[in-house]
Amino acid sequence: MSQEKNEMFESEWSKEREREKQLASGLDTAEKALKAESEELQKSKSELICLYNEVHNLPGASESRDHFLIACDLLRRENSELETKVLKLSQEFAQLNHFTLRGKTAPSNLITSENICKDPESNEPVLEIEIQSPKEEREELCPKLGERKQKEIPEESVKEGSFPREGQKEEGSQQNQDMKDEEKEQRLTMKPEEVVRLREELSRINQSLLQSQSSGDSSDDSGAQYPSSGDKLKYNQQGEVQQLHQNLHRLQILCNSAENELRYERGKNLDLKQHNSLLQEENIKIKIELKHAQQKLLESTKMCSSLTAECKQSQQKIKELELEVLKQTQSIKSQNNLQEKLAQEKSKVADAEEKILDLQRKLEHAHKVCLTDTCISEKQQLEEKIKEATENEAKVKQQYQEEQQKRKLLYQNTDELHRQVRTLQDKENLLEMTCSQQQSRIQQQEALLKQLENEKRKYDEDVKSNQELSEKLSKLQQEKEALREEYLRLLKLLNVHVRNYNEKHQQHKIKLQKVKYRLTNEVELRDKRINEFEDEIGILQHKIEKKAIQDQITAQNDTLLLEKRKLQEQVIEQEQLIHSNKWTISSIQSRVLYMDKENKQLQEISLRLPATKKQKEIYSTEVCTCNNAELQHEDESVPKATEKWKHSEQMETTISDILESEVVNEILPLSNSSFSGKGLVESFVSLQETDDIKSKEAMASSKSPEKSPENLVCSQNSEAGYINVTSLKETHGIQEQDQKSEL
């Protein structure tokens, strides 16, 4: 039920908001129309003043002045009526603004009503307050609507003394507004009393709950030895008590929100008072302006009286002229001319009268549209005045007919009359132009009146919508009464539940104490276990950290050991290379020395014991082959093998030269013998340098184990060469022994 009511509230408030928006748009249009009307009224006032000045400046046109004065009076009355309508519209606009401000505060009340519907048991008084507030607004709006309807009824009579009456009406409306403001203040002062009453009720409920709890505690102490088995009922009752506390808290919050709303409304009322004071100041200014306008009208009436005096003076002058006409009865021709001119003037006067009648008809038609009853009386007055004017015209015509005989001597004044007639014609043309302008303005005012009628229709529609809202408010009041009944029923149920709770609370208190003891013991045991587990966790974490550090250290040691092994292998390989290189160098040096010695011996033998050419050639070929074989075995891995081959070829050429010429053998210098030895030493040194370079490259690239077999091969080749040299030495030794035996 509460949800359905909430939905109903929301739908109604949404509709009211849409209507308020429509009213706001209508108010804006009304404001614009009022501004336009005020501007047009000011323009019409200025134009009327100009017309008055023109009429006063017209000399010798008394009849036309009377007609125009009548028309000006009518226009003044119309302006006064329009001003009254403008004031009414402004008052209605202010009232509608006040209504829209109240409508804006309505959504905040809606939010509070939604919260209240959720808790119908605890928030019943707040609903009553909120339902009373739209009632009060309705009561305030009803007299306002009646006043508006009364203001819409057209006034039956508008006379010359309308200005002071309008001022009295404005003062009466201001007094009514002041009375309404005072009533609102009194209502606002009453609302805090309701808030105080709600607070007292809340305090009473709190006290009753505290007393029930205290009585429950005392009964628990007395009946501690009789435990019962209604645990479920106990928990349910505790939940109900908690809900009651929550409801009380919500009531306190709602009271605070109501106080804030009251403060907000008071501030609003102060703002409205300021606004009313400003409006009063504006009304005072408008009154002052009206007084100035009245003073100007009085001045214009004085000017009219002065013009009437001038007309009388002109009539006296005309009489004097008539006397002169009686004396001058000589010119008959001038009489005829004057008669013709008078006939023309009469025709012009008739035309002017017809135009005036047309203007009067148009004005009467405009007055019929604006004012129904007042125009009839004014028309009668105008008809009487017109009759009087026609009678005066007839009398004047009779006087003119009587005085035709007397105007025979006015021939001298004809030129002056011609001039006056021309000036009058010009002024008549100007007056016709002004009349046409006034007609156009009257049409504009008629259009404005139509707009105002449309706005009145809209206002009637708003009144109907307000009636519908009043019906809805009556429905809400009925719902409020139903909620009140539900509230009383719930209060009775609450009292029953509280009694049951007090009875059962005594039984459950003992069980709660036992459960508390058990829980405290279990909690202490759990705390001890938790502390033990925390200590064990700290120890395990410390061990885990140590293991992680040890694993890191072992991993780093493994990597370092692998690097160390690699470096040791590289160092061993380098040492082996150095050792092999040293051994090869020492073996080569020994061989070189041995070869030098053999060469010296061979030179000595070749000098001492000349043999046959064939033996020498065989011996030289054997030596060359041996040397070539040694050089090939030693220099396979060396890039400078070509140089050694060149040295061997040079040796062959030298040996062949020695065998060919015996003379040269005796004079052979020692440089040739030393040449081969030194060249071999240099070649061995170059080989040693190349080996050092290769050993360094092996250290850098760490790939020396692949080169160790080559070194072994070189060493084997060098050993083979050494064996061959020894065998050659043995052969040389055998040959020397044979030669000695032959000698």
Curated annotation (Swiss-Prot):
Residue spans of biased composition, Low complexity class: 208-223
Keywords attached to this entry: Coiled coil
Coiled-coil segments: 21-98, 165-580
Keyword presence, Coiled coil: yes
Compositional bias of kind Basic and acidic residues: 1-22, 133-193
Superkingdom of the organism of origin: Eukaryota
Protein's name in the database: Coiled-coil domain-containing protein 30
Keyword Transferase carried by entry: no
UniProt record similarity statement: Belongs to the prefoldin subunit beta family.
Region of interest (Disordered), ranges: 1-25, 114-193, 208-233, 695-715
Leader peptide range in chain numbering: none
Encoding gene, per UniProt annotation: CCDC30
